Every structure is written in structure tokens, then in C-alpha cells.
Amino acid sequence: MTSTNEDIISSLYPPPPPYFKYFTEQNLNNLEIWKNKAQDEMQIDKTDLEQVKEDQDIKPPGELKFLVPPKQPDADHYRGFGNLWSFEDKLPGLKESGWTQLYKDDDELITSNTKIDELHKLMDSLLLNFLELIGVVSIDPQQFHYKIEDLKLILININHILNTYRPHQSRESLIMLLRKQIDMKRNEISEIDKTSEDIKSKILKLVDTSYIGDQEDAKCDNDSTEDEESIKNNIIQKLLNQNV
């Protein structure tokens, strides 16, 4: 029954805590009034008052105590959603997790070359234990679970060493993502520059064509004006000749 309850706690998203209903505008105003009153009575500044609150030496009365954030637990772990969580975000060691560590070096001191050597050793041990498992099953099948546990321990050690590469993998993934974004931005900039140059060239062609057309129109106008002047002169000359 206890195991079933723990599974339910771990699997289901819990409802909000019952004290969420105390977070009202009126209670928030009352909390500010209480802080100011406590500050005046104790003759301390606001920083000291907050420090006193963190030390849990004084608490607001009634419902107001739920509005003050709780103090961080003194332990290294806390329970949330049915599981234990560590305050320090780091990969727990095999010994801390209750498993036997098959290599000697510490996770924080082990070098990359040593990790590679240890992985090769563990892979050799994994293959050897698998062959031993086949031999045990062929001779005494009831003893197979011992070798299964050995294989499980080796695989857990391999998985733990691989997990130590997670920070490096995260950095490399971030670098690849940033490089990809930079390349995309550069391609976009080059496309914009190319489009801008095409538009500029088209505008220049339009301007040149319009200028040439204006020049031709002006030339035609000049030619027609000259023809009209010559016709007028010819008519005037004929009239003068007739009068003579």
C-alpha cells in the first residue's frame, strides 16, 4: 500500500497547497503594515528585519505567516513531487547513489584520456561477463542472476562515465547552435545585400533609360522647330519675290 501511494505521489501532478488562498491583496497590505510596525517597535532597519524573518525568530501572526517565504532547509536535499532533489546541481557519484565504483579515480579529477581507458576496460569486462553468463546458463541456469547483477553494475559504471561528458556536450551543442545562427544571419545579410544591389542596378537602368528618352524628345523638338522656321522663311521669301 505504501509503495502504491509513493507511485501515485511521484506520477500525479499535485494540487496547489491549501494556503494559496491566503495570498490576497488585503493580506499583502496587512503584511506590509505588520513589517512597518515591527520595524518601528524593534528599532531596526528593513534589512535586519528581513534577516530576522529568515532566521525564523519572529513570524507574522495568523494567515500572514504563509506569505513569508520559508527558510532553506539545512540539509543538502529536499523532497519534491515524491522524489529527493539536491540543492547543488551536479552529477551525484556512484558511491553517493549506493553503487560500487569500478574505477579508482574521482569523477572531478579524472581526465578525458583516463575516461577513455576506463571505458575500454569496462567494455572488455562487459563482454567477458556476457560470455560467462552464457556459460553459467548452459551449466546451472539457476545461478544466472549473479551475472546479471554484474552486468548491471558494469553498465551503470559505463553510463556514469558517459554522463560526466554532459557538461562538455552541452557546451559543444551551444557552440554549434551559435555557429548555426551566425551562419544563418550571415546568409540573410548576404541575400539582403544581393537584393539591394539588384534593386540599385535596376533603378540606375531606369534612370538612364528615362534620361536618354528625354534627350531624344528634346532633339525631336529641336528638329521640328528648325523645320517650322525654314518653312516660314521660304514662304516669306516667295511673297517678297511676287511683290517684286
Curated annotation (Swiss-Prot):
This is Mediator of RNA polymerase II transcription subunit 7. It is found in: Nucleus. One of its GO terms (molecular function) is transcription coactivator activity. It comes from the Eukaryota. Component of the Mediator complex. InterPro entries: Med7/Med21-like (IPR037212), Mediatior_Med7 (IPR009244), Mediatior_Med7_sf (IPR044888). Keywords: Activator, Nucleus, Transcription, Transcription regulation. Belongs to the Mediator complex subunit 7 family. GO terms for cellular component: core mediator complex; mediator complex. It holds the Pfam family Med7. Component of the Mediator complex, a coactivator involved in the regulated transcription of nearly all RNA polymerase II-dependent genes. Mediator functions as a bridge to convey information from gene-specific regulatory proteins to the basal RNA polymerase II transcription machinery. Mediator is recruited to promoters by direct interactions with regulatory proteins and serves as a scaffold for the assembly of a functional preinitiation complex with RNA polymerase II and the general transcription factors. It comes from Debaryomyces hansenii (strain ATCC 36239 / CBS 767 / BCRC 21394 / JCM 1990 / NBRC 0083 / IGC 2968) (Yeast). The lineage of its organism: Eukaryota, Fungi, Dikarya, Ascomycota, Saccharomycotina.
